[in-house]
């Protein structure tokens, strides 16, 4: 269920401060964050944000199509290796 419009987008304050600092200085270094729940806002466009997936930080380059989505959507937490093959199908 989407968030109410009257509440506005959720963004952790520590991440917002890092984004504002990077935009001011023009720094292209990835911003490391554990905040998967934060929403992508227009001021993040063009930045690389390293989102934690539980094991490592996955670099996510923010483009304009990503606005309104959450950071965690772009850093998968599970690796799918496929189902076991049928032994009968191999013969």
From Swiss-Prot:
It comes from the Bacteria. Keywords: Ribonucleoprotein, Ribosomal protein, RNA-binding, rRNA-binding. It holds the Pfam family Ribosomal_S19. InterPro entries: Ribosomal_uS19, Ribosomal_uS19_bac-type, Ribosomal_uS19_CS, Ribosomal_uS19_SF. GO terms for cellular component: cytoplasm; small ribosomal subunit. GO terms for biological process: ribosomal small subunit assembly; translation. GO terms for molecular function: rRNA binding; structural constituent of ribosome. Protein S19 forms a complex with S13 that binds strongly to the 16S ribosomal RNA. PANTHER family: RIBOSOMAL PROTEIN S19P FAMILY MEMBER (PTHR11880), SMALL RIBOSOMAL SUBUNIT PROTEIN US19M (PTHR11880:SF8). Belongs to the universal ribosomal protein uS19 family. This is Small ribosomal subunit protein uS19. It comes from Haemophilus ducreyi (strain 35000HP / ATCC 700724). The lineage of its organism: Bacteria, Pseudomonadati, Pseudomonadota, Gammaproteobacteria, Pasteurellales.
């Amino acid at each position: 269920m989407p968030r109410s419009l009257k509440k506005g987008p959720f963004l952790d304050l520590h991440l917002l401060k890092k984004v504002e600092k990077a935009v001011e200085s023009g720094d292209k270094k990835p911003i490391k964050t554990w905040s998967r729940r934060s929403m992508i806002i227009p001021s993040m466009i063009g930045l690389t944000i390293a989102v934690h997936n539980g094991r490592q930080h996955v670099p996510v380059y923010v483009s304009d199509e990503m606005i309104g989505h959450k950071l965690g959507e772009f850093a998968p937490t599970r690796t799918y290796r496929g189902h076991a093959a049928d032994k009968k199908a191999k013969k």
